[in-house]
């Protein structure tokens, strides 16, 4: 089965056939923010693609041939070429399909976007630590650390327009959005209390057709996380 909302393939499943000519395939998981990066770039660029969801708690044996680490996202083209790691997949798509560039051509502007991404890079591990934290006393420290990272991002928005890279969404917006989109479901939105520019940016992103097409239902996401943290093989298909 294929499609963003399709059930995932697990251990014992047959591997999918070759990628059709003129398409690209992405191995994904419905709730994964890293895979969401790749899916958003595919949509933003209008690239024909198919989605194969992988059960990350019950991985198919053949998937390790696509990525020995067993992680999503993975891109595969009709030539059998494989690309892994979310940021690398997005850069590959921007270069392999140059019709609608998401990174700016100007070297300095592109460097600025990459500097913002470097500043943002501490956010996903902090959110992951918060999700996995079993001790309530850890929560305030993690919240404070996350708030500080958001303040650093805010300080870098000196030439702020509607979006992080200018007047319209670009690569830096799509590479950061999945974690901001999950703040409400994780009850972390108050960490933005002292970053008004980031809050305005979030409001602008919610109006973007690509960003808004990836819905995160708070209750469903929390139930998924509960199952995922218990290593349940049912987690990745929760809600289907």
Curated annotation (Swiss-Prot):
Catalyzed chemical reaction(s): RX + glutathione = an S-substituted glutathione + a halide anion + H(+); L-dehydroascorbate + 2 glutathione = glutathione disulfide + L-ascorbate; methylarsonate + 2 glutathione + H(+) = methylarsonous acid + glutathione disulfide + H2O
Domain GST C-terminal: 106-227
InterPro entries xref list: Glutathione-S-Trfase_C-like, Glutathione-S-Trfase_C_sf, Glutathione_S-Trfase, Glutathione_S-Trfase_N, GST_C, GST_omega, GST_Omega/HSP26, Thioredoxin-like_sf
Presence of the UniProt keyword DNA repair in the record: no
Biological process (GO), any one: L-ascorbic acid metabolic process
Family: Belongs to the GST superfamily. Omega family.
Active site: 32 (nucleophile)
Record localization: Cytoplasm, Cytosol
GO molecular function: glutathione dehydrogenase (ascorbate) activity; glutathione transferase activity; methylarsonate reductase activity; oxidoreductase activity
Residues modified as Phosphoserine: 129
Binding annotation for glutathione: 59, 72, 85-86
Domain of life: Eukaryota
Protein name: Glutathione S-transferase omega-1
Modified residues (N6-acetyllysine): 57, 152
Domain GST N-terminal: 22-101
Pfam families: GST_C, GST_N_2
Gene: Gsto1
Function: Exhibits glutathione-dependent thiol transferase and dehydroascorbate reductase activities. Has S-(phenacyl)glutathione reductase activity. Also has glutathione S-transferase activity. Participates in the biotransformation of inorganic arsenic and reduces monomethylarsonic acid (MMA) and dimethylarsonic acid.
Species this chain originates from: Mus musculus
EC number: 2.5.1.18, 1.8.5.1, 1.20.4.2
Alphabetical keyword list: Acetylation, Cytoplasm, Oxidoreductase, Phosphoprotein, Transferase
Entry-linked PANTHER family: GLUTATHIONE S-TRANSFERASE OMEGA-1 (PTHR43968:SF5), PTHR43968
């Amino acid at each position: 089965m294929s499609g963003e909302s399709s059930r995932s393939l697990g251990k014992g499943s047959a591997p999918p056939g070759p990628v059709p000519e003129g398409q690209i395939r992405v191995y994904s998981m419905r709730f994964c923010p890293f895979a969401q990066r790749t899916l958003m770039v595919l949509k933003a660029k209008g690239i024909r693609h198919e989605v194969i969801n992988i059960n990350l708690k019950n991985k198919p044996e053949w998937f390790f041939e696509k990525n020995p680490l067993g992680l999503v996202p993975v891109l595969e083209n009709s030539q059998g070429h494989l690309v892994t790691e979310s940021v690398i997949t997005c850069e590959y798509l921007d270069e392999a399909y140059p019709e609608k560039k998401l990174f700016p051509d100007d070297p300095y502007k592109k460097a600025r976007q990459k500097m913002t991404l470097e500043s943002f890079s501490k956010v996903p591990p902090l959110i992951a630590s918060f999700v996995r934290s079993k001790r309530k006393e850890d929560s305030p420290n993690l919240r404070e650390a996350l708030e500080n990272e958001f303040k650093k991002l805010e300080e870098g928005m000196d030439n702020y327009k509607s979006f992080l890279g200018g007047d319209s969404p670009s690569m830096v917006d799509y590479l950061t959005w999945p974690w901001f989109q999950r703040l409400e479901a994780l009850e972390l939105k108050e960490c933005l209390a002292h970053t008004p520019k980031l809050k305005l940016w979030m409001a602008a992103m919610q109006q973007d057709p690509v960003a808004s097409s990836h819905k995160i239902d708070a209750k469903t996401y929390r139930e998924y996380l509960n199952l995922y943290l218990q290593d349940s093989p049912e987690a990745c298909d929760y809600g289907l």
